[in-house]
Amino acid sequence: MQVQLEDASRLADRFEALLEAKGVSIPAHALTGADMLPLWHVLKKLREGFNGIPDDLRNEYSAGIAVHDLAAKVLAVEGHPNFDMLVPHLQMLTQGAVHLTQEPPGNADVYNNLIEIYWACLLMANGVEVDLDHPVHSPGNNPDVIALDQGNPARAYAFKTVRSPHTQNLMDHLIKGVEQIERSGANEGIVAFQLTPRILQANLWPKGKYYIDWRYPAAIALELLNQMITLLSGVTRTNCTELSEL
């Protein structure tokens, strides 16, 4: 993804204006840790640009691209009839911080909330009516996002953030996701694994080094993803009997 600073600045202004119009404020609190950047700080950098050596700014570059991408997805669906369902999620997002190079804590609700907003926006951008589980007032029994067909559940999506490399943890996530989908009443569903915590940024951008061509880190990322896919495929094949009984 190539982002021009002028375009990023305009997008940051539009994103903040949209949030303000929906009653969502972005508190300018102090940084909460070396690995976390509050949303206001990232938007500020998108406006002003990034200065410094790559090692010092790798967190800000990464966060800037991520927030720019999310903001673009949200702005693309601001006229969708289901947009107000995103507001509680956006409120929660603005009150938290963006975890970057380190693995987020297990209770990082704001981090987990990112993928739900992102996927809902992708569906809405394609004209799909959605039902979004509330980010706070929810017992966790329902899928995170449900695509509707004439108001009825058609396809359910359960997102699971994978932090542990152990296969049993993956299986537990998969079973819980299948159970959530079955309770939704949808005819079909997808359990999607959020694998970002398993990709350590240090492997993609080693300290003290840089790439002259983006295809080098892209190839590393692809290899890491392929390794994870192989692991996930092995988990499902090994436990197919248990899954078929759900």
Specify the residue positions occupied by each region the protein language model found.
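Charged, structured surface patches that assemble and position nucleic-acid processing machinery
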Residues: 1-126, 160-246
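Conserved catalytic cores of phosphodiester-cleaving nucleases, focusing on short active-site segments
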Residues: 123, 144-163
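A short acidic/basic microdomain associated with nuclease active sites
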Residues: 125-148
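An acidic- and aromatic-residue-enriched active-site/binding cleft used to recognize and process polar
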Residues: 135-138, 150, 160-162, 196
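Residue-level preference for short coil/turn positions at secondary-structure junctions
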Residues: 141, 152, 185-187
